[in-house]
Amino acid sequence: NGFGVIFIAGFTATNKLYGLLETAATSYGYAITTYTGQNVGAGKYSRISRGMRAGILISMVTSLMIAALMLIFGKWILSCFITAEGQEGIGALKVAYRYLAIMSVFLPILYILHVTRSCIQGMGNTVLPMVSGLAEFFMRTGTALLFTLLLGSDGIFFAEILAWLGADLILVPGYFWMRRNLG
């Protein structure tokens, strides 16, 4: 690729940390899937809306706290993932932190994605989550190709975020449609 070793090292470091940042979102998703499935099975549909509101609220608080921590301590944390020294290490850390800062600001979008997708799955719908996954793929790929032409290497940082947004644009209206038609 044309991004260079320093860029790839920084990008990779942030992606390693991203896996950790997503852990709470994944856990909230597992919880809401079980909660929703149990309430669908019991015919207590009104509880699904309450659970979803609580899940979104907890997700927003968590994602904003994580974002603040990453903006404050991100460079220090990223330095644990970057082994290069000298100018290469400084350059990789600069790339990594820029990507982390951008990603952190938009972390609530990812958390909404996990909670909403999982709630829909708990309601028994597997098609909307699959379609949203396809939207993520095409948004990520399209953004990576287009935005790098427009913004250079910084364009790649927005591919993940716009992939999340693309999925949310399918999942959020889908949730409301399903919830209205559930009972």
Predicted regions mapped to residue ranges:
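Small-residue-rich hydrophobic transmembrane alpha-helices
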Residues: G10-A68, I72-G74, L110-S132
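Hydrophobic/aromatic end-of-helix segments at the C-terminal termini of transmembrane alpha-helices
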Residues: F3-G4, I32, F73-I77, T143
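Interfacial/gating helices of multi-pass transporter permease domains
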Residues: N1-G19, E88-V95, N125, F158
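Short runs within selected transmembrane alpha-helices of multi-pass transporters and secretion channels
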Residues: T26-G29, M103-G122, L128-R140, I156-V172
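Transmembrane alpha-helical segments of integral membrane proteins
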Residues: M139-T148
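Short alpha-helical transmembrane segments in multi-pass integral membrane proteins
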Residues: T36-V105, F147-G183
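Hydrophobic alpha-helical segments typical of transmembrane helices
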Residues: F7, I32, V95, V115-T116, ...
